[in-house]
Amino acid sequence: MKSLATETEQEVGKSIESIFVNCPDRIETKLENFPKYVRRQHLKRFLAMYEIFKMILRVKGSIVECGVFRGFSVMAWAKLSAILEPENLTRRIYGFDTFAGFPSVSGEDRTGAGSAEPGEFQTASYEELLELIRVHDQDRFLGHLP
């Protein structure tokens, strides 16, 4: 998919990456201080998910993420659940994805500059996500991800 970011926005991302890579701190220390490095748009996305999660705290049931891609949302839901409802025995977080991208795209799916292409959203993040889920469950009161 063609990037919708301006050239300046793309340069900001490269600058942040360079600062992150060149910082002498351990990676864990950098991650503990993530607001230093994360772009405003990505932090805003997480905060929006936080606000949505607060609205469903009293709603019983599971959370289903269709289209996991690299795992931002499914792991955010899991972490928000662990923080905001650590003793909820009934909430489960489910993520569904083929991780193979779109097998095909019809003309009706091509609606503008942000239109997807066959293979778009393919990612090799499945094994990484399984490992992150395992680690996440070791670091919380109750395991919510099967």
What residue ranges belong to the model's regions?
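S-adenosylmethionine/decaboxylated-SAM
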Residues: 7-40, 57, 62-146
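Conserved alpha-helix/loop element of class I SAM-dependent methyltransferases that forms part
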Residues: 46-59
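Leucine-rich tandem repeat or coiled-coil scaffolds
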Residues: 2-4
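Short, conserved micro-motifs enriched in small and acidic residues
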Residues: 39-43, 47
